[in-house]
Amino acid sequence: MAERPQRVPASTEQESALVLFSGGQDSTACLAWALEYFSRVETVGFAYGQRHDVELSAREEVLDGLRALRPDWAARLGSDRVLDAGVLGEISDTALTQDAEIAYDARGLPTTFVPGRNLLFFTLAAAVAHRRGIRHLVAGVCETDFSGYPDCRDDTVKSLQVTLNLGMAERLVLHTPLMWLDKAQTWMLAEQLGGSALVDLTVEASHTCYYGMREQRHEWGYGCGECPACRLRAEGWHRFRHGSGAQ
């Protein structure tokens, strides 16, 4: 059984958090985590010309589902906003923003890597947090089960925290509850936080597939079943359901 991510200090439980929320499995788990540990939670998403923009609709379904799941979470869940980050789609040539096949380059990076995406997302989220008087940012990046993106690494996030605080004269804290969890452990975390109801909500409402497919339902959710994101989610589900745990 996966260990639960370390609880945030008790002194933060009367504070607010801003969750970078895409509508995917990872950010859904992070949103539930934040709702468990912070007194007020707001969310921010990004429209950047992604092929799988169905995730923007999934966000609304997940938010509604979380409100219905637990009254205390509904009371803590605050405003949501989606920011226009379309410039990423304009300047990038990737399989997430263009009609292109998913492959790997000479560095071993998949063509789904959007250069600067998470760097920009954290910066925009920090600006929102500054305006809203929020000190804690929560994101679902990890470097265990991930696609090799350099902007998901722990070193990147730690460096960003320093840079954002220097550049904004703030004391922001960037939380990454999934950083050292694999996908099986992320499913376990959802179960620990919200029971089978949160697992079911994640299966039915959250979206992962890079191709944006919602026509085919699998036991782990909707998607093509073939892209790297679907395969990671499916493999994690299998280990979670069949008890083999983390590899």
Swiss-Prot record:
The keyword Protein biosynthesis does not apply. GO terms for molecular function: ATP binding; ligase activity, forming carbon-nitrogen bonds; zinc ion binding. Keywords: ATP-binding, Ligase, Metal-binding, Nucleotide-binding, Queuosine biosynthesis, Zinc. It comes from the Bacteria. Its cofactor is Zn(2+). ATP binds at residues 21-31. Pathway: Purine metabolism; 7-cyano-7-deazaguanine biosynthesis. Gene3D superfamilies: HUPs. Binds 1 zinc ion per subunit. SUPFAM superfamilies: Adenine nucleotide alpha hydrolases-like (SSF52402). Catalyzes the ATP-dependent conversion of 7-carboxy-7-deazaguanine (CDG) to 7-cyano-7-deazaguanine (preQ(0)). This is 7-cyano-7-deazaguanine synthase. The gene is queC.
